[in-house]
Amino acid sequence: MSLTEARFHELIDDLQQNVEDVFEDSDLDVDLENSAGVLSVRFENGSQLILSRQEPLRQLWLAARSGGFHFDYDEAGGRWICDASGDSLGELLARVTLEQIGEELEFPEL
């Protein structure tokens, strides 16, 4: 069953808020900007992560220094799963954050 447009936007809105909460609750110096469905996380070292919704595809895309990742929502598991690696969004966010700034963060809700 494919996601309805309303459900897709609800999931992305919740996800982006969860990501913002993790960074805001950390001791990291980050700039967060959420505009037009795109969440940008800018780190003190100048690197960034960009989470964007791809409405026509019902996908979430993550751009990081190490590359671009596309995620589909798994209704059964309640998680966004990378279509290339099978990793959850939370696993990939933890990995790319460590790679980009050398800090370990957990994204348990993702």
From Swiss-Prot:
Q: Which domain of life is it from?
A: Bacteria
What name is this protein filed under? Iron-sulfur cluster assembly protein CyaY
Output the Gene Ontology terms for molecular function.
ferric iron binding; ferrous iron binding
Annotated PANTHER family: FRATAXIN, FRATAXIN, MITOCHONDRIAL
Q: Which Gene3D superfamilies match?
A: Frataxin/CyaY
InterPro entries per record: CyaY (IPR047584), Frataxin/CyaY (IPR002908), Frataxin/CyaY_sf (IPR036524), Frataxin_CS (IPR020895)
Question: What does this protein do, in the record's words?
Answer: Involved in iron-sulfur (Fe-S) cluster assembly. May act as a regulator of Fe-S biogenesis.
Q: Which species does the entry assign this protein to?
A: Azotobacter vinelandii (strain DJ / ATCC BAA-1303)
Biological process GO annotation list? iron-sulfur cluster assembly
Q: Which UniProt keywords apply?
A: Iron, Metal-binding
